[in-house]
Amino acid sequence: MDHTIVIGAGQAGLAAGYHLARRGLPFTVLEADDRVGGGWNHRWDSMRMFTPATSLGLPGAPFPGDELFPSGAQMAAYLSSYAQRLGMDVRTGVAVDGLFRDGDRFQVTAGAATFTAANVVLATGAERVPNVPALARRLSSGIVQLHSVDYRNPAQLQPGGVAVVGAANSGADIALELAASHDVVLCGRHPGHVPLRIESKAMLTVFPLIAFTWNHVLTRDTPPGRRSREKLLSGHGTPLIRVKPQDLADAGVRRAARVTDVVEGLPVTADGEVLDVANAVWATGFLPGHDWITLPGLDSAGFLDNDRGSVTGQPGLYVLGQLFQHRFSSHNSVGVVPDAELVVGDIARRAARAGASVRP
């Protein structure tokens, strides 16, 4: 029977693995990290999920424990346990560096290793390559610089002020934590905020409705969904979820405009303010990082154009976990499971057309 290679052992890749196993389709999961869990192994220590634990579980395994909003480390541990429980063929420490087509098959390369498959699922998610502005290279060598993916806790920074560049959720969370030990300026456009506390009874009560809206209303099939997708992909980001503007103000975090220049080694904002800081944390998001794919289909933003996960013009190639891939929640735990079911459904139909016996 035709084999499927799944690239990435985060929640998207393991959700695909679950559906492939359920249908009796052979597959192998390749993970660049030395542990299952993908990017959840690389979050700051105090980071907490925005999604309640009750909505984080993958099929057949509710999220364990009594934490309402688990940490990134707890999410990674859950995913590792999930892969073991289902007996998935996951190969860690395999950094894929090439993908090309060879007739009706794909060749996936990782160093000296080559894997051949009829289907490839790119489940590397929306956070593959840190997006650090080019101007960061012009900052003084005396300024400690970290991207949010490398930030763990305040002990990594030196005494003195901190510019947190990027004012969406990661930037706001990190700025609030750093404010207890440093003078912090948070740079960037205010993205708005969710008015309710996510820990509140009201929010927990309405979360199932929110999840339904993310999955079934805000999709590429609906006008509201298409408008939301355009806004999200244009870099507007999502509203602040846990940290509120008043929290930042109460903690002494100062707001400033976007950083657009560097003068004499110091960051300068769009309105000309020079920030005399000793540290800079770049909470500036990520790039898709698909430059290792030698196939047509990448759009101008570096995303693979797809229809419900099936890459346009490349039969057998699929994506999972991309930002607003099909629905608002495609890049998080709420949306990857239904997206994975769509992708594996198409793989199963391809296998059936080739004469394979596939479980429904």
Give the positions of each predicted feature.
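A short acidic, helix-capping loop that chelates divalent metal ions and anchors anionic groups
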Residues: 62-67
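Redox-cofactor-proximal catalytic regions of oxidoreductases
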Residues: 35-60
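Flavin (primarily FAD) cofactor-binding/catalytic cores of flavoenzymes
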Residues: 1-33, 37-39, 70-360
